[in-house]
Amino acid sequence: MQKHIKEYLKHFDLGEQSLITCEYCLRSGRIDAGGFDIHHIQGRGEGMDVIGNLVCLCRKCHIRVHDKGEINKDQLLLIHRYFLIGRKIKFRK
């Protein structure tokens, strides 16, 4: 398992088989039961494998970020900050 995935799961005390929700879909009340990807908000060369830079996305939203450009970094960062605040996790850049 890749380091950034381990980091994300560790922060939320999740196992590999845990139900994980897409942070982008969750903001609008949707839950996608498909596969998930842990996405770097700032690219690997720009950011690190820290919880403030890692967001969980369903495959549909991940495609919307990379292939379609429908979701940008600023949107992801804002949604992720609210997600962390809702779980009482301090946001660190």
For each feature predicted by the language model, list its residue ranges:
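Nuclease and nuclease-like effector domains acting on nucleic acids or nucleotide cofactors
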Residues: M1-Q2, F36, K90-F91
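Short, charged surface segments at domain edges that flank catalytic/cofactor-binding sites
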Residues: M1-Y24, G47-M48, G52, L76
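Alpha-helical interaction segments
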Residues: Q2, R30, N72-K73
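Short linear sequence elements within intrinsically disordered, low-complexity coil regions
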Residues: D13, Q17, G29, D67, ...
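Histidine-centered nuclease catalytic patch
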Residues: E23-C56, G69
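Polybasic, low-complexity binding patches
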Residues: G45-V55, I63-K93
